[in-house]
Each structure stands twice: as structure tokens, then as C-alpha cells.
């Protein structure tokens, strides 16, 4: 399938092997993994970065296989879940960066078009998250009012 806003077909990549049980070489118990996730979240890491750190530094390939819960589910249980979903937050940050670029370079039409595409993705995601009940129905994307770091 093609990419959303271009005709590119993407690139091939390896797929993760389907596993039912955690690998035998993982030496962490579910409780230890859960506490690691909570500790990393308290240090300020986002869910995707927590997964990468656990994979690269602790040798934990898949949190869900070991604990039976996703990283965001663990964070929700401990009251550490981000208020906005991570993919939406990343798109909002990207739009903010492009908007700041356009303040300095107002004639950059390619970036203006890029901002339109990013904001289209934001609106599409907001609609999805409202439908799923993740965001409240009255939540609205307002680039000036939203303050994300």
C-alpha cells in the first residue's frame, strides 16, 4: 500500500517473529519489568522510548509477552499515562516545529504544504480517538492554545 500523502510504496523491513511465550533467556519477572517501566516513566521517558530502553539496555524484547500488559496499560494503572496519546503528541510537536519555521520563513511554500498534511493527520487521529473514547468529545486541536514541549 502507498503512503498516506505521497505515492511512495515504503520500504521493506523485517517482521517480528510471532511468539506466544517470552524467550527463555529473559531473566526478569513480570513484577520486575513492571517496576522498570514505572521507574523509566518517572524519569520522564515516553512509552516508545521505554520500550527501546528495555530492549537495548535490559534485554527485554517484548513487555506484553512477559507482563501480559502493554506499556501504556502499565502506566495507566500507576497513574503515569500521558494525557494525550503518544502518536498524536508527536504530530502536534511536529506541527509546532513547522509553524515556528514558517514564522521565520513565511514564503516557504513546501513547508506550508507539509504543515497542512501534518494537521490533516492530526484531525484524522483526533476524530479516531474521540470515537474510541480516548479523548473527550469537546477536545479540539488549537495550535495557539496547545502548549507542548
UniProtKB/Swiss-Prot annotation:
Residues 1-11 have a biased composition (Basic and acidic residues). GO terms for cellular component: cytosolic small ribosomal subunit. The keyword Nucleotide-binding does not apply. Keywords: Ribonucleoprotein, Ribosomal protein. SUPFAM superfamilies: S15/NS1 RNA-binding domain. InterPro entries: Ribosomal_uS15, Ribosomal_uS15_arc_euk, Ribosomal_uS15_N, uS15_NS1_RNA-bd_sf. Residues 1-25 are annotated as: Disordered. Belongs to the universal ribosomal protein uS15 family. This is Small ribosomal subunit protein uS15. It comes from Methanopyrus kandleri (strain AV19 / DSM 6324 / JCM 9639 / NBRC 100938). The lineage of its organism: Archaea, Methanobacteriati, Methanobacteriota, Methanomada group, Methanopyri.
Amino acid at each position: 500500500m502507498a503512503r498516506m500523502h505521497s505515492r511512495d510504496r515504503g520500504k521493506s523491513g523485517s517482521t517480528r517473529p510471532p511468539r506466544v511465550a517470552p524467550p527463555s533467556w529473559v531473566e526478569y519477572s513480570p513484577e520486575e519489568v513492571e517496576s522498570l517501566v514505572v521507574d523509566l516513566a518517572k524519569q520522564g521517558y515516553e512509552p516508545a522510548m521505554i520500550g527501546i530502553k528495555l530492549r537495548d539496555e535490559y534485554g527485554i524484547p517484548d513487555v506484553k509477552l512477559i507482563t501480559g500488559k502493554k506499556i501504556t496499560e502499565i502506566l495507566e494503572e500507576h497513574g503515569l499515562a500521558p494525557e494525550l496519546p503518544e502518536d498524536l503528541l508527536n504530530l502536534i510537536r511536529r506541527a509546532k516545529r513547522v509553524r515556528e519555521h514558517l514564522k521565520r520563513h513565511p514564503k516557504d511554500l513546501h513547508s506550508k504544504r507539509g504543515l497542512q498534511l501534518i494537521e490533516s493527520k492530526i484531525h484524522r487521529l483526533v476524530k479516531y480517538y474521540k470515537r474510541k473514547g480516548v479523548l473527550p468529545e469537546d477536545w479540539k486541536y488549537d495550535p495557539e492554545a496547545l502548549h507542548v514541549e
